[in-house]
Amino acid sequence: MPQNEYIEQHIKQHGRRLDYEERKRKKAAREGHRIAKDAQELKGWRGKQFAKKRYSEKVAMKKKIKTHQESKVKGPATPKEDDGEALPTYLLDRQTNNSAKAISSSIKQKRLEKADKFAVPLPRVKGISEEEMFKVIKTGKQKSKAWKRMITKHTFVGEGFTRRPVKMERIIRPSALRQKKANVTHPELAVTVFLPILGVKKNPQSPMYTQLGVLTKGTIIEVNVSELGLVTAGGKVVWGKYAQITNEPDRDGCVNAVLLV
C-alpha cells in the first residue's frame, strides 16, 4: 500500500464507527446552516473568497440544470425517405416540432421584445456622491449635533405627503425643490406636453434615492399621459407611462423627460 494511506488501511482492517452513517447524515444536514452563517458573518478577504466560491458553485449548478433540461427536450424526428407507404395515425405527429422547444423560444423572444420596448435614451449616467446629494444640518443648542441631512437635488413627493415632526425628521426635502410636473416629449409624435408626475420608478444612483423621490438625470419617472389620449389595443385609455429624465433639474429648475414608448 502507498504511503500516507494509513487511514484507508485502518478502515479496511477494523471497519468504521458504529454511528458513522448517522454522524455523516447529521453533518450533511448541518451544512446548509453553516453556509448561511458563513455568508452572514465572514468579513474582508475571507468573505470575498467565500462569495467567489459560492458564485462559481451556483454557476456550475445552473449549467448542470440547464443541460439536464435540454437533454429532456426532444427535437423533431429525423425524416426518413418517402418510400410511398402510408404512416399510421399515431406516427403522424413525429414530424412536428416539440412543444417545449416552441414555448422556450417564444419566451426568449418575448423577453427580447420587452428589453427593446423599454430601451432607455440614457443607458449610463454619471454618479453623484453623497456629499453633493446631502447637506449636513447642524442642530442643538450648541449646534454640535449633525445627524440631519437636507437633500440638495429636486425631489417628488406624493399628494398626501406630510412632514414628520421637526425633532424626528432626519432627511429634509425642501419645499422649494419639490417638483410636481415635467416637460415630457413624445419621441414618435414629436410633441412636448407639461404632464403631472405620478411617482419615481427608479433612480440609477441608489435605491435609497428612489425611495426618497430624488429627481436626477437618468431617473425613470411615471407620468400621467391621459391628456395625450393614448389607447391600448383593448380600447382602454392609458393612464400612466414611464419617462426618463434627460436634463439636470437642479441646474435648469425644471424637469425634462422623454417618454418610453
Swiss-Prot record:
It comes from the Eukaryota. InterPro entries: NSA2_fam (IPR039411), Ribosomal_Se8/biogenesis_NSA2 (IPR022309). The keyword Transferase does not apply. Pfam families: Ribosomal_S8e. Signal peptide: none annotated. Residues 7-34 have a biased composition (Basic and acidic residues). Keywords: Nucleus, Ribonucleoprotein, Ribosome biogenesis, rRNA processing. A motif (Nuclear localization signal 2) lies at residues 51-58. One of its GO terms (biological process) is maturation of 5.8S rRNA from tricistronic rRNA transcript (SSU-rRNA, 5.8S rRNA, LSU-rRNA). It is found in: Nucleus, Nucleolus. Residues 1-34, 61-85 are annotated as: Disordered. The keyword Ribonucleoprotein applies. Component of the pre-66S ribosomal particle. Interacts with NOP7 and RRP1. Interacts with RSA4 (via WD repeats). Involved in the biogenesis of the 60S ribosomal subunit. May play a part in the quality control of pre-60S particles. Belongs to the eukaryotic ribosomal protein eS8 family. Ribosome biogenesis protein NSA2 subfamily. This is Ribosome biogenesis protein NSA2. It comes from Debaryomyces hansenii (strain ATCC 36239 / CBS 767 / BCRC 21394 / JCM 1990 / NBRC 0083 / IGC 2968).
